[in-house]
Every structure is written in C-alpha cells, then in structure tokens.
Amino acid sequence: MSQQSTAVKVFDHTQLNDTHTPQQVIVELMKLYYTQGWVSGTGGGISMKKDGKIYIAPSGIHKERIKEDQIFVMEQDPEVQVVDIQSCQHLKTVYSPNDNGYNFKISACQPLFQLCYDVRGAGAVIHSHALSAMLATLIYDKEFKVTHLEMIKGIRGHGFYDELVVPIIENTAFENELAGSLKEALEKYPNTFAVLVKRHGVYIWGKDWVEAKTHAEVYHYLFDCAVRMKQLGFDASSKQ
C-alpha cells in the first residue's frame, strides 16, 4: 500500500507572484538577497505595503533564516498625528511574532521604510548593505550620477541618454537618526527611487515588490558599474 506524501510544497523566489502573501515574498527575497551579499550579517531588510497593512522583518536576526510568522504587521492609526518621524507612533501593531513566543524587535529601518511610503507612495522598500552601494558613496560626494548606460532604462522614467541621479546622505550611529536627512532627500529628488547612505548602503523602492525588485537589481548593477569604471579610469557620469 502506498503512503500519501505529506510533504509541504516548496517554492522559491523564481515562482513568486501576486497570489503569494507579503510574508512569503519577504522571506524568499531575503534568501535571494542574502546570496547576493545585500543583507548579510543580519543587516539590511525589506518591507512591503499591501491593503493598508505594512509588513516588516524583525531586527538583528539572520535575514536568510527569517520565517513567515516572524514578520511584523502594522497599520496606520488614523487617530494619531505624526509628530516624530523617528518613532512611527502613528502605526499600531496588527501582528507581532512575539505573540507566538518569539522575542524580537521590529526592524530599526522602520522609520525609513515608512518615510518611503508616506512621502513617495512606495509599495515596497529594500534596504541593502551591498558592497557596491557602499563603495559608490566613496567615489561620489553628495550625488551619485551616471549616464549613457543601457541599464538606466530599468529605472522608471529614465532612458539611455538621461543622467540618473541618486542623492547621498551622511550616515549616523543609529538607523532611525537617518530619518530627517532621508525625508529631505525624498522631497528634493522626486525622480529618484533610491537614496544612498555614505559608508553604509542604500534604500530602494518601487510601486510594488515587483518594481522594487527591478529597481534594486538595476541600481546595484549601476553602482557596481560606476565603481569598476572608476578603477579602469572611466567616469560613469560622462558619456565620453
């Protein structure tokens, strides 16, 4: 007599689509970005917004090992006015993994993710600690600039001949202290979908997780390209 298999159906990031929950998307993208060095050493993170709810991974744990029931779920409290953008006091918890026996803190990136939602209408945000992003902040001062590179087309509203500009803000000792300068950059650069943080990494977003993923892959390619062109004596901000 044959036994019926009770194995759980397994999928990975290559099969993600709109039928998957935000928790499933975050878990799979974390695994993918860990292999690319974007969220190693417990750093970096991903957040998504869907149907009025905000999904955020916990802080200080290995991102490639995050499980679906470890994702915080928040929503905006309409009765609370935003006074301090660092505290996110206008958000209330819908689900906490600590209700299931965990002892986690929500990602320290929460105020930065929330700014991308509030100021830019993002649907998903990726925070990367990729080496290429960090190095790019060392070869540019206040703005990362590239032009005449084919991959620029992958950023919404940009083309091959355009100058793609990404603002660079100064790093701080604690993530939430970036809120003020990030808000200023979001308002000053309406055409960007990324903000670099000096000697740290980058925040990248899109209208949903699909566009955020596309933007993240394109920006990281351009960061790496600019660094390598610099090593070869070329200027990525020039068409020459």
Swiss-Prot record:
Keyword Cell membrane found: no
Compartments where found: Cytoplasm
Textual note on the cofactor: Binds 1 zinc ion per subunit.
Pathway: Amino-acid biosynthesis; L-methionine biosynthesis via salvage pathway; L-methionine from S-methyl-5-thio-alpha-D-ribose 1-phosphate: step 2/6
Names of required cofactors: Zn(2+)
Recorded superkingdom: Eukaryota
Major localization class: cytoplasm
Active site, renumbered: 150 (proton donor/acceptor)
Single biological process term from Gene Ontology: L-methionine salvage from methylthioadenosine
Reactions mediated catalytically: 5-(methylsulfanyl)-D-ribulose 1-phosphate = 5-methylsulfanyl-2,3-dioxopentyl phosphate + H2O
UniProt keyword annotations, A-Z: Amino-acid biosynthesis, Cytoplasm, Lyase, Metal-binding, Methionine biosynthesis, Zinc
GO molecular function terms listed in the Swiss-Prot or TrEMBL record: methylthioribulose 1-phosphate dehydratase activity; zinc ion binding
Positions contributing to Zn(2+) binding: 127, 129, 200
A single cellular component GO annotation: cytoplasm
List of residues binding substrate: 109
The enzyme's E.C. designation: 4.2.1.109
Free-text function comment from the UniProt entry: Catalyzes the dehydration of methylthioribulose-1-phosphate (MTRu-1-P) into 2,3-diketo-5-methylthiopentyl-1-phosphate (DK-MTP-1-P).
Family: Belongs to the aldolase class II family. MtnB subfamily.
NCBIfam families documented for this protein: salvage_mtnB
Identification of the protein by name: Probable methylthioribulose-1-phosphate dehydratase
